[in-house]
From Swiss-Prot:
Residues 15-35 are annotated as: Disordered. It comes from the Bacteria. This is Holliday junction branch migration complex subunit RuvB. The lineage of its organism: Bacteria, Bacillati, Cyanobacteriota, Cyanophyceae, Synechococcales. It comes from Prochlorococcus marinus (strain SARG / CCMP1375 / SS120). Residues 202-273 are annotated as: Small ATPAse domain (RuvB-S). NCBIfam families: PRK00080.1, ruvB.
Amino acid sequence: MAIVSSGFEKHSSSNLSRKTRLLDPTPSLEEGKVRKEDSLRPKCWDEFIGQSALKEVLGISVKAALSRKEALDHVLLYGPPGLGKTTMALVLGNELGVKCRITSAPALERPRDIIGLLLNLEPNELLFVDEIHRLSKVAEELLYPALEDFRIDLTVGKGTTARTREINLPRFTLVGATTKPASISSPLRDRFGITQRLNFYSISDLNRIIQRAADLFGLSLTGDAGLEIARRCRGTPRIANRLLRRVRDYATVQNQLKLVDKSLVDKSLTLHQVDECGLDQSDRRFLLFIIDVHNGGPVGLDTLAAALGEEAATLESVVEPFLLQIGFLKRTSRGRVITQAALEHLNSCKNSPIIK
């Protein structure tokens, strides 16, 4: 196996923390703030680009629920972060003409947290729970009768004076979102009438998403420029919008807001060390360590973690999934192995200003 020299330093200060990566699909603090110009979320089926099979399934269920004038079945959406699970829940609410209340499982620590939410629901409303795999056991048990029989059972009093009080709830729809469906307990998972996966987006769909966001930003983007961002965003709309913001910053400083072309996009993303395959410095550091130090592998995850100064779980959940997805990495019984495709890509990039 040919070797690509990286100038790798064992004690490099580079860090793979999710909080600092431009290509991290989890929402950043910037994206958590609602600002007028950054309200990029679609509000209806027509505005939601991609996921055509999912939209067809949910669209039929929505029309059926509306025709019967009843609540939609409980919905479980799963898939990698950044693909639009929260957005889909909001679109469902708009299409049904009801309010969508949003919370996350970690926020429902105490029984009164989930009870308060359930008691305040109006008929046919949506309750969206993000990271539902992180629900506590107590919260889950409170949800079981609420999901199945639309009631909650409260225990009043203590000891011999304790008694159970049954409170009826209006019919509602729980929309759960998770990146780890296997971590959801079977009793909870079985109570969802509709379970659907969100898949990574195609380049053409991402280009349409980017062009729509550029219009909302008041940015004039050529077709080639949109495609260039789409190729580097890992099939994830959240990353696409984040890269577009960085391109907009660069165009603002360069006074080229009137027309953003492919050349400007390339300069901007090269500045952020995002290459044409969507790899960033952390990805390349991971790959180049295996190549330079272990001749392409195999190498164990714990060895990689120790050498890179990261936790094994961080590498496994943050860096490896995309490299596996694009065929740059293989997991074997003996450890991680670099593929020929990864080697060819790194060889082609070795003279690029991205590789420093």
